[in-house]
Amino acid sequence: MESSASPPRSRKAPEERREEILSEAASIALDEGLERITLRAVATRLGVRPGLISHYFPAAEDLVDEAFVRAATIERERFFPDAGSPLERLAHFVHHIETGASLPLARLWLNARHLSRFIPSLEATLQEQDSLDRARLRAIIEDGVASGDFAAVDPEAASIRILIAVDGGGSYVNSTDDLTHPAHVHFVADVAEWTLGLAPGTLGAVATS
């Protein structure tokens, strides 16, 4: 007579399990918002007990912080490719925003900035991730100034102006209003071109060429 007992589950290595938990939490952050990250929600998605999640992340706030870092890191790599000229890399950055590809990240940042008022550790995480984004954008601008693609601007000041434009546009991400006016759609491109001494429409032309 054959046994009907279920085969024993294989135990995952701690590093593998932790990565699995973080990946799922980051997915929840992008899809539903940081406040939806709970030990139970992650456990349900993974088909495990909440106690397993708390073994790796005793406090839900720790999981929220690290999930935000994971999601922001993944999206950063999509924003800032290493290949191409400085002008092409900046055009990719702007095109990623204008086409709506960055909407999940915009929602995540808006969500995180709100929650950081109540979670001090998240505020520190936000500052760190913002600094990393600024460094990547600053590197593109430094390369562009050196190559002559951009005007001789202060790369730090230029990166701050452009990212403020990104955040300003992102603040409308949950709006149901009609935001198709060119002044809204191309706001980041307009600011970047003005800041870097580029002719209007340059970045759009490069992105679609």
Enumerate the predicted regions with their spans.
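Hydrophobic alpha-helical connector segments
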Residues: 66, 77-107, 158-162, 185, ...
